[in-house]
Amino acid sequence: YTACYEVTKDVLARGYRNIAYMADPPIYRPGCDRLRGFRDACKEFGVTVPQENIFLAPIEDTKPLNAFLHDVARRDVPPKAIINFVRGWDYTMLQALHSAGLRVPEDVYLTGLDDDNTLPNFGYSMQYLPSTIDFSETAAKLLIERVEAGNALPEPERRIFTTHMKPVFERKVTLPKPDAAPTETDEKEK
């Protein structure tokens, strides 16, 4: 919830209103939480994103997602920001935008999950906390506790992580002109 809420809030605070959102469908818990975070941030800014700019589909459903990306990129007025919470679609998004003659980040600001680590090529990245190392250390400690317990297994323990995500600009980048007046953001661009 939190990571998607923060990313959406950042996009809206930058003044973008013509945006697209991609994520797993709400039949999966992460998809449900992310959609709620997206909607809550939009509600906070009084923004309604048209349904044709929202795509909710599992990763396995490649044809509709490809069609959505190519449709969005080729519109007369394409979105100025795309919030992506579908894992592993960074290169496909770049290919769809490039084939339509759009530049990142000058024409379209991409944000959200960056599994392929492509955004640093454009002068910014997404800081996602807690890191994979934090998750791995917690899982390893729980596993060691179970192994060391022998036959007397410890009580199952549930750890809840609150994720956070924000853009980090490594250099001065030119983002698309906003649709509305920007508001104050937490991020200080270099």
Residue ranges and their predicted role:
Residues 17-18, 49-53, 103-109:
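Short acidic capping loops at alpha-helix termini that bridge into adjacent secondary structure
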Residues 1-6, 22-68, 83-91, 113-116, ...:
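Hinge/beta->alpha junction and helix N-cap segments in small-molecule ligand-binding domains
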Residues 69-189:
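Flexible loop/turn connectors
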Residues 17, 24, 32, 51, ...:
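A generic "cationic amphipathic patch" detector
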